[in-house]
Curated annotation (Swiss-Prot):
One of its GO terms (biological process) is DNA repair. A zinc finger (C4-type) spans 57-72. This is Recombination protein RecR. InterPro entries: DNA_Rcmb_RecR, Rcmb_RecR, Rcmb_RecR_Znf, TOPRIM_dom, TOPRIM_RecR.
């Protein structure tokens, strides 16, 4: 059966979303056309507006509609002296939801991966270095992912910080709350032992 070129284009466009394969994209397209045309129109409007108006903060590189995001513009955070380095803008959202961090951020938009052609320049480490030189931070907290690439990225940034005599720490990685030891992989368990804290 030959389908409409517009329908085919819609299905193909939906496939750009993470985790959406041909079948899922087809289900979404048919759902919007059959049962939720208003929702589809609203989605199209929201996508168009977001794509044209959302850019990157000139200080931390997270997503924002302004030149400088609300976190970087917050005077209380400007005087905290803390900078948290994350891989993705979504990492900021996750950290903010904990309510445990009151400093500022720098978003790498990825991690070092030489095999994929991603070096220091591609993740903006020259911008991070400039920021460390121009602003007064007394501690940089590295919140990169606990992967080989995340570790390599954290080690590279740690060197930059130490060259400027800035204290550098890495968020702890270990056993999740409610997790059972027998289900935890060896690398995570090793991190848990290395990152153990004294009680009392």
């Amino acid at each position: 059966m030959q389908t409409s070129p517009l329908l085919e284009h819609l299905i193909e466009s939906l496939r750009c979303l993470p985790g959406v394969g041909p079948k899922s994209a087809q289900r979404m397209a048919y759902h919007l056309l059959q049962r939720n045309r208003n929702g589809g129109m609203e989605l199209a409007r929201a996508l168009t507006e977001a794509m044209s108006k959302i850019g990157h903060c000139s200080h931390c590189r997270t997503f924002t509609e302004e030149e400088v995001c609300t976190i970087c513009n917050n005077p209380r955070r400007q005087h905290s002296g803390l900078l948290c380095v994350v891989e993705q803008p979504s990492d900021i959202q996750a950290i903010e939801q904990t309510g445990q961090f009151s400093g500022r951020y720098f978003v790498l938009m990825g991690h070092l991966s030489p095999l994929d052609g991603i070096g220091p320049k591609e993740i903006g480490l020259h911008l991070l270095q400039k920021r460390l030189q121009e602003e007064s931070f007394h501690e940089v907290i590295l919140a990169t992912n606990p992967t080989v690439e995340g570790d390599a990225t954290a080690n590279y940034i740690a060197e930059l910080c130490m060259q400027q005599n800035i204290k550098v720490t890495r968020i702890a990685h270990g056993i999740p709350v409610g997790g059972e030891l027998e289900m935890v992989d060896g690398t995570t368990l090793t991190h848990s032992f290395l990152g153990r804290r004294q009680l009392g």
